[in-house]
Amino acid sequence: MITKLSHTSFFVSDQNKAYEFYVNKLGFKVNTDATMENGFRWLTVTPPDQPDLEIVLFPAAGSNGFEEEVNKALNFLLEKGVMGAALFILWTAVLLMKN
């Protein structure tokens, strides 16, 4: 049984916009904001009331981070009134939310 979560990842289309939203609008704290020699940016934030939870804001691959067919499936479910869809990719469950 999982009783506590210490790390999770959000794939974001723009890390600067994600920073603006999570830090400046929601009041999250920045844990790490470092750019590696290869240009990869490692950006993690923590909710103000959960200092033990670290969220990695990963840059999404491509235009939005999802393959076209996955987006079609998600849109189909959203059109049916589903707010989020759990998709299982290999052994990993990913919760996709779109508004």
Can you say where each PLM-predicted feature lies in the sequence?
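A generic structural signal for ordered alpha-helices
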Residues: 6, 23-24, 74
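Core segments of cupin and vicinal oxygen chelate
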Residues: 10-62
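Vicinal oxygen chelate
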Residues: 1-4, 9-10, 13-16, 33-34, 41-44, 62-99, ...
